Curated annotation (Swiss-Prot):
It is found in: Secreted; Bacterial flagellum. GO terms for molecular function: structural molecule activity. It comes from Rhizobium meliloti (strain 1021). Keywords: Bacterial flagellum, Secreted. The gene is flaB. The keyword NAD does not apply. InterPro entries: Flagellin, Flagellin_C, Flagellin_N. It comes from the Bacteria. This is Flagellin B. The keyword Cell division does not apply. SUPFAM superfamilies: Phase 1 flagellin.
Length: 394
């Protein structure tokens, strides 16, 4: 039936043309944006996942920047520690040279002073972005420095920032700005007090050098005696005793003229009365602190071996600290590589969810353009039908 009021063919062609136009707009949006899910209306689930993962990826980008900053801090501290180790090696060499008879210790001390100033300069300059890991205030105990390591979202959706920690303590900083507990300003107890006793047994005199208890460490007379030396007590029964073959024998200080020497090899015990033929010779090593080394002082000049031992212990601590910094640097490098790969993986995963396949979209767009042309032709034909009706009235 032909109607002049309703052109059903034209209406159908127009509806087809509208549908094709809508599909073309969608396809053109995909082509222009590169996304097949550009908004929640396209696919709510995929859009939600992609939005969350993009947010996490931005956080990982910030972590990457923080790792770069942390690596710079660690590298600065390591370079400073490495330079300080070389300087301390020079100080050790100067002390060894000072042991030679006839050398001018004052001249050597001048060189040591310059090296000590260089150590201070290194510690003060080893700072990056206001952070100095070679000197710190340790009055409140160890100080923990942290470097952002990663951004984590667990299975429950909770997020957290993981950190890489490094402790600034007496074995890792060169100087304690609030005291004397850093590697270079603390005192190394390299030698304990000793007493040399000349012992006369039946006319034969021998000398024995032994370590002794400190004056404030008294041995209880009822305690088991295992070879340590006892000091004189106080009171009516002044003195400490050791048991020899079932009998208690009084043990007295080295300042007294008589000594009780006890021998115990596990199976045999015996005691010998001795007589000190002269004042016992004592030896107390001078404290060894690199920051206070001054071999022009008699007490230190006479204990160069102790000073060298102290410097060697400081070198051991510095080497250990440098190794720790190297380990932290390696961990940061590994973490940085991992964060890069993780970020790439997230980008790839998000792309699979929301990116448009440009080959598919371009092919679809070409097909829709062809369909649009055909729909226009169809609409044109449908509209011309009314003109055919007019010819009937001519």
């Amino acid at each position: 039936m032909t109607s002049i009021l309703t052109n059903i063919a034209a209406m159908a062609a127009l509806q087809t043309l509208r549908t094709i136009g809508s599909n073309m707009e969608e396809t053109q949006a995909h082509v222009s944006s590169g996304l097949r899910v550009g908004q929640a209306a396209d696919n709510a689930a995929y859009w939600s996942i992609a939005t969350t993962m993009r947010s996490d990826n931005m956080a990982l980008s910030a972590v990457q920047d923080a790792l770069g900053l942390g690596a710079a801090k660690v590298d600065t501290a390591y370079s400073g520690m490495e330079s300080a180790i070389e300087v301390v090696k020079e100080i050790k060499a100067k002390l060894v040279a000072a042991t030679e008879d006839g050398v001018d210790k004052a001249k050597i001390q001048e060189e040591i002073d310059q090296l000590k100033d260089q150590l201070t300069s290194i510690a003060e300059a080893a700072s990056f972005s206001g952070e100095n890991w070679l000197q710190a205030d340790l009055s409140g105990g160890p100080v923990t420095k942290s470097v952002v390591g990663s951004f984590v979202r667990d299975a429950g959706g909770a997020v957290s920032v993981k950190k890489v920690d490094y402790s600034l303590n007496t074995n890792s900083v060169l100087f304690d700005t609030a005291g004397n507990t850093g590697i270079l300003d603390k005192v190394y107890n390299v030698s304990q007090a000793s007493v040399t006793l000349p012992v006369n047994v039946n006319g034969t005199t021998s000398e024995y050098t032994v370590g002794a208890y400190n004056v404030d460490d008294l041995i209880d007379a009822s305690a088991t005696f295992d070879g340590d030396y006892a000091n004189v007590g106080a009171g009516a029964l002044a003195g400490d005793y050791v048991k020899v073959q079932g009998s208690w024998v009084k043990a007295v200080d080295v300042a007294a003229t008589g000594q009780e020497v006890v021998y115990d090899d596990g199976t045999t015990k015996w005691g010998v009365d001795t007589t000190v033929t002269g004042a016992p010779a004592t030896n107390v090593a001078a404290p060894a602190s690199i920051a206070t080394i001054d071999i022009t002082i008699a007490a230190q000049a006479g204990n160069l071996d102790a000073l060298i031992a102290g410097v060697d212990e400081a070198l051991t601590d510095m080497t250990s600290a440098a190794a720790d910094l190297g380990s932290i640097a390696m961990r940061i490098d590994l973490q940085s590589d991992f964060v890069n790969k993780l970020s790439d993986s997230i980008d790839s995963g998000v792309g699979r969810l929301v990116d448009a396949d440009m080959n598919e979209e371009s092919t679809r767009l070409k097909a829709l353009q062809t369909q649009q042309q055909l729909a226009i032709q169809s609409l044109s034909i449908a509209n011309s039908a009314s003109e055919n009706v007019l010819t009937l009235f001519r």
